[in-house]
From Swiss-Prot:
GO cellular component entries: Derlin-1 retrotranslocation complex; endomembrane system; endoplasmic reticulum; endoplasmic reticulum membrane; endoplasmic reticulum quality control compartment; membrane
Descriptive protein name: E3 ubiquitin-protein ligase RNF139
Biased composition (Acidic residues): 629-639
Taxonomic source organism: Homo sapiens
Residues bearing the modification Phosphoserine: S634
Amino acid sequence: MAAVGPPQQQVRMAHQQVWAALEVALRVPCLYIIDAIFNSYPDSSQSRFCIVLQIFLRLFGVFASSIVLILSQRSLFKFYTYSSAFLLAATSVLVNYYASLHIDFYGAYNTSAFGIELLPRKGPSLWMALIVLQLTFGIGYVTLLQIHSIYSQLIILDLLVPVIGLITELPLHIRETLLFTSSLILTLNTVFVLAVKLKWFYYSTRYVYLLVRHMYRIYGLQLLMEDTWKRIRFPDILRVFWLTRVTAQATVLMYILRMANETDSFFISWDDFWDLICNLIISGCDSTLTVLGMSAVISSVAHYLGLGILAFIGSTEEDDRRLGFVAPVLFFILALQTGLSGLRPEERLIRLSRNMCLLLTAVLHFIHGMTDPVLMSLSASHVSSFRRHFPVLFVSACLFILPVLLSYVLWHHYALNTWLFAVTAFCVELCLKVIVSLTVYTLFMIDGYYNVLWEKLDDYVYYVRSTGSIIEFIFGVVMFGNGAYTMMFESGSKIRAFMMCLHAYFNIYLQAKNGWKTFMNRRTAVKKINSLPEIKGSRLQEINDVCAICYHEFTTSARITPCNHYFHALCLRKWLYIQDTCPMCHQKVYIEDDIKDNSNVSNNNGFIPPNETPEEAVREAAAESDRELNEDDSTDCDDDVQRERNGVIQHTGAAAEEFNDDTD
């Protein structure tokens, strides 16, 4: 089979996109029906039977709309094909009824609200229009139901019979009889088609039920819902639903404003425009479905914002592409937590603006999480290109300036309350995070500017990051207290209590636990490093070697492990954060009281101390190699001692490359 060329692939992709867009458009009416049912309430003045019947019909409408919403693409197209055919049949019957019984053919003139003429004045012209209309309905009906036999012609003729009776000016009772007979024949044919398709509907329903049950048993409810969510493109459906709803409302409101102002101008004043925007925003979150639709729109905006920032700063991390998921989830949780859709219109607008401020600060925090790794990688890799550093520094500056401006504007227009306190705390925390990142970035850039090893760099970076983590922990505790006060004295809810529990676990407990663990690991590593003997002065010059971890020379001092390997104290301490073994021979790093300084064993470079013959050094090195083999199977050696040393150094170099990526 020949390979598909690029033009054919483009045509195929365009074809698939068109079908996907059509599928999304066909699922949107189901959301309109569900939203209309949820926004309507039964009339309490009616009898109990009528109320129960209305509730049953609403539940049935929600259930049927939900089933149509999750249909497969093929089943969805078939459903709309049959529905369109039945709609054409009903429209044809209504047109025949209205034309036969309610139109004066000798004075027909119908206008719409805009003054546009719909039907011609003269009778023959109206007859021809009715014939063309019924032919269109009949051809569409038989085409959609795929009726190809002689019955298709009879059905079209059946639709034209009432028009023929109208043209021949038959008496009224005969026209009524013809209309009733035509409608009955069309109804019987529709019922017959439904009966024929009922078998297909039964087997399709049974197949879908068995498939869903099978997937539920194998994969569980969560994966089943995720698969359905992706298959029907539910976020796209929500976006189209919300945007079309807002567009329709905007069109109606614009028409009302034009009629109220009695002007033909397309433009409106700024006051009317602001009122229009406020009304659209208020009506755009008046139910749970509309809040979901707004969340889907926010998801799309946040997704492309995140992609733009990633492209601007030059990041390729896949985990940083989750802004389009985090932002809508947070917005929806805030809406549920504050009861946004159930508030009065004025309160809803105020609450929505406050939620958007909180969402903005959260998005800025997420963007900082995107820029911080890029900032650290640029500073640690010693890249001097201005084009690489400027975008990240520019975004960091914006992340510092925007929270300051937001806090200034809010404090200038609002009095202090729990919401303003929370937004201000988030802004101050973000500014401190940016300061910490820029400080660490500056330290690494200073270290890269000098060629000498800066042994205190790790300590300074740890102090800066620890200070930032402690301040962040304090802010987490303060925000927990602010949320507790809000829940007890302002607006308590189960969702707020649940979110406070999550905040206490992730932002307080886990952060404190991880910080304490890091502190203890560092403290233990420092104790172990301080317990190791140190080489300085002339003896350090006699070694004339480099550290096996960082490959830098020993300039000031070196630490000797119990297995008589030597490293920089800083490098060995970083290694001990990861594992408690020697990087060279993988023995435990510990100090015993009876261990003394022994330089009669080979070190990193096979250094032979003075007053010792090479033959003795080789014999002792071979004996030491045998002992290492007996103690640890992870080292490889041959009869040649030098080959063993080379293998160990290569192994250590690979570990050191992985270790050097850690900046803690």
